[in-house]
Structures are given as structure tokens and as C-alpha cells.
């Protein structure tokens, strides 16, 4: 078991090969609660997160909100460090790699739902569930699609993008 996304990189050389491969990684670092309970994850990044928060325009109204938000940012920094991709460039895999990143839910672990609504500028709880899905590969210009999709769309998207041989009757999405 692991707590830090960075620990997964310790096994990178066992995952990567010169042959095409697929790896599915679920990270834990961004999950709440955003309290001292998750210090293993947030502590390495707290000082930097505090510096960022001090210059932000996030509309917190209490020190407790500020601390919880700061810890969430620190935990996100752990995942950012893992996703950074320097390791792909260092071993020459960046040009033949596709990264797909998605979250399964919004930051529902915050103790104050109204605070999250204020940050996102959205009060409809259903709309708060809109989460990003990112597909990255070297040399492709960034694009934004604002269509509503679901996690059930990911597998058919992968099949289509890579022209995989698949019986689409068994896929929904």
C-alpha cells in the first residue's frame, strides 16, 4: 500500500518497457479529508501551499476554511508532482505516451459545501459534480470540449482513439 503518489514512481522502471504497454493508476493523494489526518500527504507541500493561498483570491471567511483549503491544495500538489512527466522525458517515452486523467468526483470532502459552491461559482449540487477529463500527448495542441460525458465514455473513447479491435456492443457511452 502507499499514501504518496510519488511513491508509485519507485516502481516506474518495473512498469515501463520498450514494448507498448497500458497502465491504470488510481491515486489517493487528492482525496480528503483535508485535515491533519492526511499529514503524510500534505506535509511535504504545506509551506508552498500556504504561500500560494496567501496570494489567492479564494473567498474563505474563516481560518478553518483557509486551513482546509490549504491542505487540499497541498494534497493536489502531491498529485501534480507525480503527473509532472519529467520521468517520461528523461527516459525518452514522452513522445510515445498518452496520459488520460480524470477524477471520479468533485472535492466532496470539504466540511463546508457552501464554500465549495463559492469557489466554483456554482450552487447547483449536480453541476458541482462536473469534473475534468484530460487527454494529453506530446505535440497535440490543447483543446477544450464542453460536452457532458461520463466515466462510462472513457473506455469507448480509448477504443476509438487507438483504433482498437473491440466489439462496441459491449460498451456503453
Predicted ranges, named:
Residues 1-173:
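Solvent-exposed soluble domains appended to multi-pass membrane proteins
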